[in-house]
Design a protein with these regions (language model features):
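Extended, low-complexity, intrinsically disordered C-terminal regulatory tails
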Residues: 46-90
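Intrinsic-disorder/low-complexity regions
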Residues: 8-9, 15, 29, 33, ...
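Short amphipathic alpha-helical segments, especially helix-boundary/capping motifs
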Residues: 21-27, 79-80, 90-94
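Intrinsic-disorder/low-complexity loop/linker signature
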Residues: 24, 33, 75, 139-140, ...
């Protein structure tokens, strides 16, 4: 089993911490360094993303707010993010894998979300951990990849679900 620090260092070769946290959290805690942020994530999601990035050898985009993009809730969702705030205002219980550092939404350069999901199924035996993939939202295939490492022992290596 790989050491935590090695997984963190491998992850940082391909991703900036700004890609996985909100602007508010980054601004408040960036003085504590990258390992502080990474320690808030399940090690399985970090290792799985490194596997995907190195095996596909294609750029992956999670949050892009750092570069002026529109995505800022595709990694850790915290109390500064609108999705969490909106649910709290409605007193709507919500147990998202994003809130507990177990999920990423992402895009892979030059691949559609369906192509990425198909690729993951093809290489499922090589994945370091079991994963869950969101497929459809309100009956339509989503245009991004949602991947999480919530591990229900009743699920297969890759479990697809719709919301």
């Amino acid at each position: 089993m790989m050491e935590t620090k090695q997984i963190y260092d491998d992850f940082l070769q391909y991703f900036n911490v700004e890609e996985i946290v909100s602007p508010g959290i980054y601004e408040k805690y960036n003085h504590l360094g990258d390992y502080f942020f990474l320690s808030r994530f399940d090690i399985r999601i970090l290792a799985t993303m490194v596997f995907i990035r190195t095996t596909l050898n294609k750029a992956i985009t999670i949050n892009d707010w750092l570069w002026g993009g529109r995505f800022d809730e595709r990694g850790l969702r915290d109390t500064s993010t609108p999705m969490v705030q909106d649910r709290a205002k409605k007193n709507d219980p919500w147990l998202s894998a994003h809130v507990v550092g177990m999920a990423f939404d992402f895009d892979v350069k030059e691949m559609t979300a369906n192509e990425v999901r198909e690729w993951l199924f093809k290489f499922r035996d090589c994945l370091p951990y079991k994963i869950r993939l969101e497929r459809k939202l309100n009956g339509e295939f989503i245009s991004w990849v949602h991947l999480d490492v919530c591990d229900d022992p009743r699920n297969p290596k890759i479990y697809s679900f719709d919301v």
